[in-house]
């Protein structure tokens, strides 16, 4: 039986020598050519076309068989697909790599995450509907009075922090601390009555995203005026008196003799 020569013998004589353009010729000039660049071997069922030059009909059987062997070897060689791999191609592979499973979040134990959340704050001053400013009256009390000129420097600057609470379209939960002081407005029950007070806190722990409910007020905006409703005692509001230099307190009526409307001025 006749032995078919390997590619390294006769076929190398017809090899072009260019790695980027591999082809085999029957004889001399490129009469018959099979280039890697011309073959897209990505489809497994794709065939290879073999072009025969009839001018070389007198070539020997060994050379003809060598060409066929070379073509078969080229056909079996793994040639990269020229198509560029894109992001959408990766998305088709993900379902085969990862298995989708539902994730259940236990919201009962998320206090630590809420505590670590950053707190957004701003500095501001507040004046009631009669343009009375809020100033300190003793170490733990605020009062409302009219200020003018240089006396305006006496008014309290609040650090308003946006905290966790029952937020809605018209209510934004906030905490009201005094700037540069470890004091926060809080609502507690004294003598069976909701009462407003200034409470001292540890600056290492305050402000925080999840404040205790006694520190939380629902900021409500109505006709460019602000109201501050106690989250601990609904329908009770930060209030001032019609009279001058009276303490700021927690009142249970709106639109009556007590003033519950305020304007806010931002402070840099």
UniProtKB/Swiss-Prot annotation:
Keywords: Cytokine, Cytoplasm, Inflammatory response, Lysosome, Mitogen, Pyrogen, Secreted
GO molecular function, one term: interleukin-1 receptor binding
Pfam family, one: IL1
SUPFAM superfamilies: Cytokine (SSF50353)
Cellular compartments per GO CC: cytosol; extracellular space; lysosome
Cross-referenced Gene3D superfamilies: 2.80.10.50
GO biological-process terms attached to the record: cellular response to lipopolysaccharide; cytokine-mediated signaling pathway; fever generation; immune response; positive regulation of cell division; positive regulation of immature T cell proliferation in thymus; positive regulation of T-helper 1 cell cytokine production; positive regulation of type II interferon production
SMART domains: IL1
Keyword Transcription (UniProt): no
Propeptide regions on this chain: 1-116
Function: Potent pro-inflammatory cytokine. Initially discovered as the major endogenous pyrogen, induces prostaglandin synthesis, neutrophil influx and activation, T-cell activation and cytokine production, B-cell activation and antibody production, and fibroblast proliferation and collagen production. Promotes Th17 differentiation of T-cells. Synergizes with IL12/interleukin-12 to induce IFNG synthesis from T-helper 1 (Th1) cells. Plays a role in angiogenesis by inducing VEGF production synergistically with TNF and IL6.
Protein name: Interleukin-1 beta
Species for this entry: Macaca fascicularis (Crab-eating macaque)
Gene that this sequence comes from: IL1B
